[in-house]
Amino acid sequence: MSKVYDWFEERLEIQAIADDITSKYVPPHVNIFYCLGGITLTCFLVQVATGFAMTFYYRPTVTEAFASVQYIMTEANFGWLIRSVHRWSASMMVLMMILHVFRVYLTGGFKKPRELTWVTGVVLAVLTASFGVTGYSLPWDQIGYWAVKIVTGVPDAIPVIGSSLVELLRGSSSVGQSTLTRFYSLHTFVLPLLTAVFMLMHFSMIRKQGISGPL
């Protein structure tokens, strides 16, 4: 094993990278409340893993979506556990994100020179809320259907472009298959990709600038 490690070390300087990751200074004022962002990240990773597992059984059609969710809950091996963890972790992610935002605001972590870190965090908060809206509709039950109808109907109040935005969100003039397809694509591909990109930016800036000092 040492020869294999030495081969990679010679080319990639693994030890230097590991030292840089593990040797960052942690200010003495840091407490458990500074872990809220990391807990949010952990919840996101759980969401990715459990969500990926459910894509093997979920069918994003208005005629089969609800039945496929029932199959996951009643027949698929450990399907009930995977979906339950997905739901619990989703709620935990939203809660931890809200608490993290409050912690950063109350401790002044948004001030110079960390304005861009705050901006990426706000974007991540919006993406997290979007996960909730799109995921809520996927079982395509009565609650999901009417939630989608209400949410996608909100932009209709915007002058001039309102009706166009509604049709863009729904895929047609009414809620149906096109709407479910759009929400499924957003929930399983677009939002996770954007979240991963902004999380990378967010953590890179934290690594560069360090943790903000006490008030």
Curated annotation (Swiss-Prot):
Disulfide bonding pattern of the chain: none
Residue numbers binding heme c: C35
One Pfam family per UniProt: Cytochrome_B
Residues reported to bind heme b 2: H86, H187
Repressor among keywords: no
Bilayer topology annotation: Multi-pass membrane protein
Chief place where the protein resides: plastid
Cofactor binding note from Swiss-Prot or TrEMBL: Binds 2 heme b groups non-covalently with two histidine residues as axial ligands. Binds one heme group covalently by a single cysteine link with no axial amino acid ligand. This heme was named heme ci.
Superkingdom: Eukaryota
Record-linked HAMAP family: Cytb6_f_cytb6 (MF_00633)
Function: Component of the cytochrome b6-f complex, which mediates electron transfer between photosystem II (PSII) and photosystem I (PSI), cyclic electron flow around PSI, and state transitions.
NCBIfam families attached to this UniProt entry: PRK03735.1 (NF002990)
Protein name as annotated: Cytochrome b6
Organism of derivation: Glycine max
Gene name of the encoded protein: petB
